[in-house]
């Protein structure tokens, strides 16, 4: 039987952004990170709407991957509905990575390029797949891992919550062991800090996930802090309820902003066009690549 041990979260605007568009959920047994996009305040609205939907949606008796997928689909409905009626948020969207601890293990739901990691036996494994243009190029052999790290379109995502009426959700169950640590984070961390560095920080702070989260955010800022940074960590087994949220990362992170609360809003570190345009651009590039591969095969 899976049981939540300690848990912690931290979010930071980073060094290059004026506002924070990330949101998180720290409500055991439910954990999540959302990284909004859309420019102005739209990205922050999207991430907060999606995060709030996770906490106030009753999935009924559904369990496992279907439950997590239904939660994300409800978040998608709310974000898309808001963007459809509010011109100021048109085209907004958000990534969403969710972990739900159940008796059968940890259920993961995922859309976008935020990530979930599992730390076990002194090893780290990325358990979600990035829905991004760069990852598609990697899978087809068009880019090397080294080229992907500096690719100018590495922030272009191919799937997001809220940009369309429906969304495909990756959902699956991870079997757990006592001592496992799960880490959910926005790309503001993973673009700045390598996986082996993340592992090193977690391994040195297994008994203090609050400290681990703080050190990971600090490492991302030392690496440049080019985007908002959000980290949620929780362990399996051990003592219940040792939660920690830093003073800038309270549960207000899932509250909807009003006209007077703009200091925590941020523009996502994305060079390409925001919102739906990013998805369209990604699709067009993929089509062009497929055509070029077909022509290359015919001419051989």
Over which residues does each language-model region extend?
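PP2C/PPM-type serine/threonine phosphatase catalytic domain
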Residues: 1-300
């Amino acid at each position: 039987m899976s049981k939540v041990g300690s848990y912690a979260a931290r979010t930071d605007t980073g060094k290059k952004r004026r506002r924070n568009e990330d949101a998180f959920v720290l409500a055991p047994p439910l954990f999540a990170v959302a990284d909004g996009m859309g420019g102005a305040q739209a990205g922050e609205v999207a991430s907060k709407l999606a995060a709030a939907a996770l906490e106030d949606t009753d999935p009924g008796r559904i369990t496992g991957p279907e439950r997590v997928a239904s939660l994300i689909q409800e978040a998608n409905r709310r974000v898309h509905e808001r963007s459809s009626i509010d011109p100021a948020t048109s085209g907004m969207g958000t990534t969403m990575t969710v972990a739900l601890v159940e008796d059968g293990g940890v259920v993961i739901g995922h859309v976008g390029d935020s990530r979930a990691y599992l730390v076990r036996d002194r090893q780290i494994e990325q358990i979600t797949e990035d829905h991004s243009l760069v990852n598609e190029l990697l899978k087809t052999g068009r880019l090397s891992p080294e080229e992907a790290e500096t690719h100018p379109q590495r922030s272009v995502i191919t799937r997001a919550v809220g940009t369309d009426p429906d969304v495909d959700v990756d959902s699956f169950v991870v079997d757990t062991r006592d001592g496992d640590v799960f880490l959910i984070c926005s790309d503001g961390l993973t673009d700045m800090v390598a996986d082996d560095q993340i592992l090193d920080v977690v391994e040195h702070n297994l008994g203090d996930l609050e400290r681990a989260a703080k050190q990971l955010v600090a490492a991302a800022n030392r690496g440049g802090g080019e985007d908002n940074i959000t980290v949620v960590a929780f362990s399996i087994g051990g003592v219940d309820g040792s939660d920690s949220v830093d003073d800038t990362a309270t549960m207000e992170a899932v509250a909807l902003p009003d006209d007077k609360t703009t200091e925590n809003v941020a523009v996502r570190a994305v060079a390409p066009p925001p919102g739906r345009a990013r998805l369209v651009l990604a699709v067009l590039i993929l089509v062009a690549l497929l055509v070029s591969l077909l022509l290359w095969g015919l001419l051989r």
